[in-house]
């Protein structure tokens, strides 16, 4: 059997694909090694969403190809979104790769390892619970993919072309996955998809995330469910009402907005207008006081004027988001935005990213001043550090704890905040 070292690139949705492949390989009795020097096979699961992701994949493939050329590994397999996006152009670019497999190849990874063969297929038009899964996150926190693909057509985005149409898992499959996670000691589940709040649209004819959540919160051992990748259009009053009354749903919402200026939103082909976005944020905070909001913004979208940018910067200051990710616009071939006129210069994009990050830093400083002396519930990731409801794994802040003598990773504790700087807070267990 192969000795396999795995490299998983990209987002949490990609990570769940890696977990599925490793679950299959583990079931088939392959050896999964944590030290690359012990491997005879390297499996790279790639991301291709934007240029920096493709550049990272390129570096890893070339590095692994060098190891193969030196005789340090026998096989090199490349999976995921890069294969799905660029397909048959890849073998000539990376001749030492034994097999490129797209998203449909995940289920056949055992056969690919044994008998390497390229597999270029359209994106799947279905989604089901994985037969096997090997969790790669901390034992107490896991990602659960409730849907895949996307029916939105944002002008800058390649995801629909890579991942295919939006399709939801059955509720029965999701609940079964969550129960299996509970059995393995998971305390926190982050629900993920390309468009999580649209869950069930394809099955029931309307978004049905609340219906799913009502089933999930009955699972006794899971204390936190976290909603990631929400679209403002499908963040409904019913969903907010349920979050407000159900303690197992984190008062946290990851809702990428991308911009606020009306001309830019229209050019992006976003479904919500400026007024609708502002109204939705107001509604969220009315129904769920204290809700932590995370969002993403794109700086330097084609046609973004200085006036558009200043409006976005002012919006960040006004909206007071708890967490903000800022990205320079990435020109993606095949998207409407790639051929738009008035492309913004790279130098200006970089400057605008820096200004938005600075604007958000000032917001965080004001939020932090109000945190001192407050008591928050924290899920410990290790003996000295954990996360509050406001902190998603890997991408948000953390809470450093003092006075921990009897608690372990996976325990929930109450922490009194004593200081805060940036996205990191410090407190004492009480």
Swiss-Prot record:
Co-factor binding details: Binds 2 [4Fe-4S] clusters. One cluster is coordinated with 3 cysteines and an exchangeable S-adenosyl-L-methionine.
MF (Gene Ontology): 4 iron, 4 sulfur cluster binding; aspartic acid methylthiotransferase activity; metal ion binding; protein methylthiotransferase activity
Essential cofactor(s): [4Fe-4S] cluster
Reactions mediated catalytically: L-aspartate(89)-[ribosomal protein uS12]-hydrogen + (sulfur carrier)-SH + AH2 + 2 S-adenosyl-L-methionine = 3-methylsulfanyl-L-aspartate(89)-[ribosomal protein uS12]-hydrogen + (sulfur carrier)-H + 5'-deoxyadenosine + L-methionine + A + S-adenosyl-L-homocysteine + 2 H(+)
Main location: cytoplasm
GO biological process annotation, one example: tRNA modification
Similarity annotation: Belongs to the methylthiotransferase family. RimO subfamily.
Protein name as annotated: Ribosomal protein uS12 methylthiotransferase RimO
